[in-house]
Design a protein with these regions (language model features):
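Active-site/ligand-binding-proximal alpha/beta "capping" segment
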Residues: 153-190, 264-283
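Zn-dependent metallopeptidase/amidohydrolase metal-coordination segment
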Residues: 194-232
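Short acidic/polar active-site loop segments enriched in Thr and Asp
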Residues: 93-94, 190, 209
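Metabolite-binding pocket within alpha/beta catalytic cores that recognizes anionic/polar moieties
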Residues: 1-138
Length: 283
């Protein structure tokens, strides 16, 4: 049954494949984490939302959903709209996302972390917006301040290789990329995934900071002779609690900081006022 009132939260967490097996954040050992409400489903202009969890890290409230809101019978574009419409109504100002990714850069290996500073949108999910009233300038689309917090939290909980910049190439999926597609991306991108777009656009549209933590789970086809499905499976199940710890630590350490980034300032009123001259019925 859909809820009518959307609770306020300052953080949004878009869970991905890195935490899908861990029931984030319910099983984390942190004493300051409290589940406040569960299985919250809201009516949105784009259909019923995915189930959200409301939780607190200390005094900071966050809303999270699993697997980017993707589910059967709902397009990925609408799933993203539903998630970010709820975030907007909840007054979320910082959004964290995570997922497993493949490699385009031959220097990366499974179990490397990358916190990208830019992206390439190769998906077909174009024109995914909430109401179109803003001109979205995508400079520093991945918030430098939130990325720095993610980096510090990852270093605290992970002793492996962490890269604090790189380019994420977004494809449609759900299949993985062919060797020719990966070859095309070599030299243009470092990692390949399916979720950063349209999330990064929608975060800017609602005026929120956005950053992502991406865990390498496989080599892109042709980067190495073969990659192991068994390794990917082990990563999904064995490393999920650690990824959850990183996200919780990032919320804990970022919450007290004021925003000094440009994320909100880079959302401008549209110049096409004859087209978008008032809020839409989905705004």
């Amino acid at each position: 049954m859909a809820q009518q009132e959307i609770p306020a939260a300052s953080f949004g967490v878009v869970g991905g494949s890195g935490t899908v097996s861990s029931d984030f954040p319910a099983r984390l050992p942190d004493e300051d984490i409290e589940i406040l409400a569960d299985n919250l489903i809201f009516d949105t202009p784009y259909g019923k939302s995915p189930a959200f969890r409301l939780f607190a890290v200390g005094e900071v409230r966050a809303l999270s959903c699993r697997m980017h809101g993707w589910r059967s019978g709902v397009t990925r574009a609408d799933a993203s709209r539903q998630v970010f419409w709820v975030f907007r109504e909840a007054h979320v100002v910082r959004v964290l996302s995570e997922s497993g990714v493949g490699t385009a850069n031959h220097l990366l290996d499974p179990r490397d972390f990358l916190i990208p500073d830019d992206y390439l949108d190769l998906s077909n999910r174009k024109d995914v917006m909430l109401d179109g009233r803003y001109l979205l300038i995508m400079r520093d689309a991945l918030c430098p301040e939130l990325r720095a917090s993610l980096l510090a939290a990852t270093k605290k909980h992970f002793s492996g290789r962490i890269f604090d910049r790189g380019i994420y190439a977004c494809t449609d999926g759900r299949h993985f990329e062919s060797p020719a597609e990966v070859a095309m991306l070599k030299g243009c991108a470092d990692i390949i995934g399916q979720s950063i777009c349209p999330e990064v656009y929608l975060a800017r549209e609602i005026g929120a900071c956005y950053a992502g933590l991406y865990y390498v789970v496989n080599y892109g086809e042709g980067i190495r002779p073969k990659w192991s499905y068994g390794t990917m499976k082990d990563i999904f199940y064995d490393d999920a609690p650690m990824i959850g710890e990183v996200l919780a630590e990032t919320i804990r350490e970022t919450a007290a900081k004021e925003r000094h980034c440009e994320c909100l300032a880079l959302r401008k009123e549209t110049l096409l006022k004859d087209v978008y001259n008032e809020a839409s019925d989905k705004g």
